[in-house]
Amino acid sequence: MTDLLSRAHADALDAADPLRSLRDAFVFPQHGDRDQTYLVGNSLGLQPRAARAMVDEVLDQWGTLGVEGHFTGPTQWLTYHQLVRDALARVVGAQPGEVVAMNTLSVNLHLMMASFYRPTHERGAILIEAGAFPSDRHAVESQLRLRGLDPATHLIEVEADEPNGTLSMAAIADAIAQHGPRLALVLWPGIQYRTGQAFDLAEIVRLARAQGAAVGCDLAHAVGNIPLTLHDDGVDFAVWCNYKYLNAGPGAVGGCFVHERHANSDLPRIAGWWGHEQQTRFRMDPQFVPSPGAEGWQLSNPPVLALAPLRASLALFDQTGMAALRAKSERLTGHLEQLIHARVPQVLQIVTPAEPMRRGCQLSLRVAGGRAQGCSLFEHLHAAGVLGDWREPDLIRIAPVPLYNRFSDLHTFVGQVEAWAAA
């Protein structure tokens, strides 16, 4: 009988994997004469092989047509951002008109808060999770100060209440209920970046809206990682980056969702010419007439060269579907969890929740012995060509991505942990 935790079994799982050929669609950094064991797609996804051809297509069109490339050629730049719209909508569970690729995450967060954070004398507080990604916290604090409000009184942080530093739904519900009459906005992640915990966004929306608060989401670690249903959940807005699980390259164009109930609203916004309705944009009229839906929040014409790699990656998502990717992801992360518990339980503590519905692909790991030991292991892994990432003060994050990671990669990782522990 095959040992279910053996490398031979992992190799058999890889051979039987219906998605195994997707790995060939990506370029892997090299370690000596082999591919790196790349388990850091939660920080930067790998380059799709098709990305180079799509970037070259834009360069060729620029060289051949010059400015006319905006209106002629195989991919007109006037509407290039719409080439990724439908696929992005499928990834996040939205209607096509509810999404747009533009700017970057933090810029989009400020744009959304300018419209959806509408403080009054009685209702001006913003609720976030304690330990939120620093850029989100910076954005929230600065928005409060721009409105003449003090973060000390108007920024409410929900503290972790579970042993590993994660948050129960009960704690979130209690905070929303306790502060409900003061809340103007609940800003919540799809997945918490340090712990890897996934949240029930539909329930958070239900609780917040019952109190009269708007709801926005940072989906940086959720988009392309777990299935999302933003339209059905009723989120007011969401923002994300496309360089992690959506593999659009370093500093890639971000994404934004605005629920269709706001499509033709008179919400105040920070406006720019590319958000003006397309049919009359080039009349250059002084009055701003927003495009319906999320596109009405655009400022400038999109960076076409930066959108090209996103097109390449989204084609793979359309080819495969989030359901199939999620099924493999649960198996990969579950296998990693089993290996850690069976082979290195005295070395690694898993911080991320064990329930599959409360996590994505990432496991956040704390090394026994404290920060110095964690740094030592991280450096050992890097030297061995096994890439995760480090998050202060003491976590190693490992993210097996179903598009390109294998079950055997997880054995390589655990084997290197064992080698370090035995040294």
Swiss-Prot record:
BP term (GO), one: quinolinate biosynthetic process
Pfam family, one: KYNU_C
GO MF terms held by the record: kynureninase activity; pyridoxal phosphate binding
Cellular component GO terms held in the UniProt record: cytoplasm
Binding site for pyridoxal 5'-phosphate: 105-106, 133-136, 218, 221, 243, 273, 301
Catalytic reaction equation(s): L-kynurenine + H2O = anthranilate + L-alanine + H(+); 3-hydroxy-L-kynurenine + H2O = 3-hydroxyanthranilate + L-alanine + H(+)
Biological or metabolic pathway of the protein: Amino-acid degradation; L-kynurenine degradation; L-alanine and anthranilate from L-kynurenine: step 1/1; Cofactor biosynthesis; NAD(+) biosynthesis; quinolinate from L-kynurenine: step 2/3
EC number: 3.7.1.3
Cofactor names: pyridoxal 5'-phosphate
Domain of life assignment: Bacteria
Keywords: Hydrolase, Pyridine nucleotide biosynthesis, Pyridoxal phosphate
Sequence positions bearing N6-(pyridoxal phosphate)lysine: 244
Subunit structure: Homodimer.
Similarity field: Belongs to the kynureninase family.
PANTHER family, alphabetized: KYNURENINASE
Described purpose of this protein according to its UniProt entry: Catalyzes the cleavage of L-kynurenine (L-Kyn) and L-3-hydroxykynurenine (L-3OHKyn) into anthranilic acid (AA) and 3-hydroxyanthranilic acid (3-OHAA), respectively.
The protein's name in its UniProt record: Kynureninase
Species whose genome carries this gene: Xanthomonas oryzae pv. oryzae (strain MAFF 311018)
